[in-house]
Swiss-Prot record:
GO terms, biological process: photosynthesis; respiratory electron transport chain
Gene name linked to the record: petB
Membrane topology: Multi-pass membrane protein
HAMAP family tied to this protein: Cytb6_f_cytb6
Entry keywords, A to Z: Electron transport, Heme, Iron, Membrane, Metal-binding, Photosynthesis, Thylakoid, Transmembrane, Transmembrane helix, Transport
Main location: membrane
Note on cofactor: Binds 2 heme b groups non-covalently with two histidine residues as axial ligands.
Its biological purpose: Component of the cytochrome b6-f complex, which mediates electron transfer between photosystem II (PSII) and photosystem I (PSI), cyclic electron flow around PSI, and state transitions.
Name of this chain's protein: Cytochrome b6
């Protein structure tokens, strides 16, 4: 590379970063691609906003049935820009779901799920399910009336499943009734299990897209 800096030369010698840059910038983009093909990327941006704002809120949120609601109220009223952080978190959550739905429709209508991209579609469906789980678990964390009854209803749904239904309900609730253990489990799922699971499937999804490229027009 002409007129390269010593810092660039140092990294280039060890990591060959120019090859990576060339691969990224020279990837072929089909001429039929339009703005609707950006919906998946917008969904990713929403997730990153969720991750950042959610991480910020963990500094103040207390996952106990006695302090959860008051800690959220404290965040909204006393913490500098706390109201903005939580509001952005909620808005981007809604936007993420909307962009995900539109992205799924775009992929389906343009045949992006067909051979050889079946696994890309499968990972996308898994991520859609995880996103719904994000909404369910996050809705409960303020532990207000809406959150409590939402948890009680959602965690009771598996009871209709034959044989394993009661076991699944108890597994979700951490006992026979909704309480502290339930909130702890939902908090753990929302802040640790689901984000990292989604990140793994996102990586798989993007690597497959990178390998196979964007599907052609109908």
């Amino acid at each position: 590379m002409a007129n390269s800096s010593p810092v660039y030369d140092w990294f280039q010698e060890r990591l060959e970063i120019q090859d990576i840059a060339d691969d990224v910038t020279s990837k072929y983009v089909p001429p039929h691609v339009n703005i609707f093909y950006c919906l998946g990327g917008i969904t990713l941006v929403c997730f990153l906003i969720q991750f950042a704002t959610g991480f910020a809120m963990t500094f103040y949120y207390k996952p106990t049935v006695t302090e959860a609601y008051s800690s959220v109220s404290y965040l909204m009223t006393d913490v500098s820009f706390g109201w903005l952080i939580r509001s952005v978190h909620r808005w981007s959550a809604s936007m993420m779901v909307l962009m995900l739905i539109l992205h799924v429709f775009r992929v389906y209508l343009t045949g992006g799920f067909k051979r050889p991209r079946e696994l890309t579609w499968v990972t996308g469906v898994v991520m859609a399910v995880i996103t719904v789980a994000f909404g369910v678990t996050g809705y409960s964390l303020p532990w207000d009336q809406v959150g409590y009854w939402a948890v009680k209803i959602v965690s009771g749904v598996p009871a209709a499943i034959p044989v394993v239904g009661d076991f699944m309900v108890e597994l979700l609730r951490g006992g026979e009734s909704v309480g502290q253990t339930t909130l702890t489990r939902f908090y753990s799922l929302h802040t640790f299990v689901l984000p990292w699971t989604l990140a793994v499937f996102m990586l798989m999804h993007f690597l497959m897209i990178r390998k196979q490229g964007i599907s052609g027009p109908l």
